[in-house]
Design a protein with these regions (language model features):
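Extended, charge-rich alpha-helical interface modules
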Residues: 1-72
């Protein structure tokens, strides 16, 4: 059985382009972070890139949460 939150997310994925774009961006950034963090050695530039990706990922998560709050 799906929670109300999951049902709302499914609804927004179909109806709200801004939410869909934020979720797609969040997923893409998560994949990029996974790839970067799997490296056996991180250069200082890699570490900076990881911090930037994490901030962007958090911003997209915040955007999704703001949209969810509007529909609750």
């Amino acid at each position: 059985m799906k929670s109300k939150e999951e049902e709302l997310i499914e609804k927004l994925m179909g109806e709200n382009e801004e939410f869909r774009n934020a979720k797609d961006t969040h997923s893409q950034l998560a994949r990029q972070l996974d790839e970067m963090e799997r490296k056996p050695y991180l250069t200082p530039q890699d570490e900076i890139e990881i911090k930037i990706l994490k901030k962007k990922k958090l911003a997209s998560k915040d955007q999704m949460e703001r949209i969810l709050m509007q529909y609750r």
